[in-house]
Amino acid sequence: MSPIKAIKAAYFSPSGGTKRAAVLLCEQFGLPAEYIDCTCPPAKLPAAIPVAKDELLVLALPVYGGFGPRVEGLFSQLRGQGGPCVILAAYGNRDYENALAAAARQMKEQGFVCVGGIAPITPHVSAPSLGAGRPDEEDMPVFAAFARKVLAACENEPLRPAALPGDADAPRKPLRPTGRSRDKERCNHCGRCVRVCPAGALNELLEVDSEKCINCMACRFACPTYAWQFDTTAVRACLEENFSARRAVEWFAE
């Protein structure tokens, strides 16, 4: 097909780690890039976000329990025209499991051909020492090699989907419970947490819908008075004991 002229990067990044990884990857393509922040309830986004056939979609998401975020309608606005996309599944040094496969299938259903996938490591939201500082300088040559391979794959006619690991039909695991609480003395009721919650799990009374909450901690990161707290002591100890060894960035491209 004709050469790619630009990048469109759609990302979900409550803590900022996935966005940073997406920006670092997009810089490797050497093309103009437009960034679309999907870290909000899908209803707040345009009904349709078209992506031209000569644009490469970079879909960037964090991994929670082996899949992308469990947010109804996430990325559903993206509309492909048979053009290429790549999936970036950022994870906190444990495993990305089925995230690439599941996201690739969704994008196929929305009109894209997934020509590649990459799984960089970013700081774990519950155990920040895992993936601290990553992606780092050691990861950049890997990002560059992936970008070169993707651009070459985009010249195939027709485009060929990459073989990505994982099972899009695997059952989702329940999220590990965290001790979520709000310090009512610190809280000034500014409503910022309600506005930034990407899952729509907080109402105006600051009540949490536990069925919707994905433990992304966007509320905690956004709170100007540090009123929201998550007790991740047990989860952090388990992760640090079993998953502290540095993992390499893995990528796949046709």
Task: List the predicted regions and their residue ranges.
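FMN-binding flavodoxin-like domain, especially the glycine-rich phosphate-binding loop
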Residues: 2-9, 13-40, 46-177, 231-254
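Iron-sulfur cluster-binding cysteine motifs and their immediate structural context
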Residues: 182-183, 188-214, 218-235
